[in-house]
C-alpha cells in the first residue's frame, strides 16, 4: 500500500511550508550567496566557554579511555555492538551528552559533542552513528527545541540514563518526497491511533522511544498534516519486523517498523498538528553537524594511515611519500582535513553562541564533509594499494597492521545519502541561497500569481535590484593589500570576496534567464552551492589559522585555499560550459530503451521482487526482532 500519487505542485507546497520562512538572525552563508562577505559574523573567531571546555576535556578523557577498550573489529565481524559496549556508553552518560544536566544529561556544547562523536567513531563508525541518530535527530533534540516541560521531564531522564531513541520518517515508498507520507495518526479519544510502516529506522531495533512522523487527517478540531509524536516502542501494536543490513556500518541497528492501531497519548504530540516536517528540518539545522563529525574522524584516520604508511613503504629506493603521484594525494588529505575541521568547529561554535542562523552553514558542512571524506578515504585506499583493498582481519592474519581501510570506505558511503542526499542538499541549500530573490520577485515568476501581485512584485524587485546590483561591481577584494590582518592568507580572503560577488552575479543571471525554470536546472544549482561551500570552507580555514597563530595551521590553510580555488574556478567555468541539456536528453533515451543493447552480454537482473516493496495495513505477520539488552 502507498498513498496515491501526489502532484509536483502539492509536493512543492508541502516542502515550502516546512522550511523556516523568516530569518530572525544574521547568516554568514546567506550573505555569502548574496555577494557579501560578512566577516563580522565569524571574526573574531568564536571561543568556547573555558569552564565548559574544562568539563568537556575531562569527559573526553574518560570517553577516550573507554574507546580504547572497544574491539572495533569484533563489531565489524559480528555485525553487532556488544551489550557491554552499550552498557559502558550508558554508564559514561554518552546517551545524554546533549541533554541539559537538570534532566540528568551532560549538557555538552555542540562543539564538544561533535568532538565526542569523532572520537568514539574512531573505535568503530557504527558507534558514532548510534549516538548521532539517537541525539541529533532522535527524541532529545526535537524535545529540546519543541517539547513541553512535561515531555522533557518525562522522557529526557530516561534517555540520559541510556535508553535509545530513533527517528522514523522514511517509508518503503517515501524518501525525499514527504508529501506522499502514508502513515496515519487518526484522532481518537485521548490521543491518536497510529498505523503505517517505516523503513530504515536507525537504532530501530534497539530504541525504546521513537520520534514518528505521520499524517493526521484534517477534520473538525484538527488542522491535520504531517505531525511528530513520541511513541513508546513497547506499546501494543509496534513490531520490529526486520533488521536491515548494508554495505557498511555493519553494527548499525536499523529496522523496518510496523505500527498497527498503536495508541499514542495526546500528551506525546510534539509541537502542533501539521508541524512535523518543520520540526524535522529545524532539528536538522544543528543535528546535521553530527554527520560531518564522523566525516572528520574519517579524514583524520585517512591522514594518519597515509602519513605513516607512505613514510614506511619504500618503492624504487624512496618512501612512496616522496613520489609526486602519492605526495599530491597526501597533501589533499591533509589540507581537506584541516578545512573540514575548521568548517565544523566554526559551525558548532556559531550554534553554541546562538547569535546566527546557521541553516545554510550546517547544510554546507554536511554536504562538503560527506563528499570530501569519501574522496579522502578513496585516496587513502589508493595510497595503500592492494593492502587498502584487503580487510583488517586478513592483514592481521598475515602479521601486518590491521588497518581497516576498505571498511572506512564502505562505512563512509552512506554519508552522501544520510540526512539528505548530496542531490537533495544541493536543492535545499540553493532554495535558501535564493530566498532573498524569491521574497521580492517570486510572484513575477509564479504562474498562479495575479496581475496585481506580479505588478507589486515588479515594483519591489526594481527597488531591491537597484540597490543590490551596483554592490556586486566593486568590493574590498579588488583593493591591493586588503584583509592584511590575515597576513599571508590575505590574498585568499580577497579571492573569497571577489568570488562571492561573482557567485551572486551568476545566480542573478540564471534567475533572469530561466526564471521559474531555474528549479529544474539542478546541475547549475549544484555547482552554485558547491562554489559557496568552497568559499565558506576557505573563510573558516583562514579565520581559524589567523586566530590560532600556529605556523603549521597557516601552511595548511594556504594549501587548502590553493586547492579550493582551483575547484571553485572549475565550477565557475562549468556553470555555462557543460553537457547538462545533452545529458538530460540522453537519459530520457536510455530510460526509453534506445540503448538497451548495451546491456547485453551479462546475466539479467533478478526477476523476483519489486523495485519498491508494497505493504498492507494490519497486524504484523512476522516475528518481532527487537533487540533487548541482556
What are these regions (language model features)?
Residues 1-134, 143-153, 157, 161, ...:
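Flavin-dependent oxidoreductase catalytic core characteristic
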Residues 173-176, 200-203, 220, 246-253:
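Short Gly/Pro-enriched turn/cap motifs at secondary-structure boundaries
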Residues 237-246, 251, 255-257:
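Glycine-rich active-site loop/lid that clamps phosphate-bearing ligands
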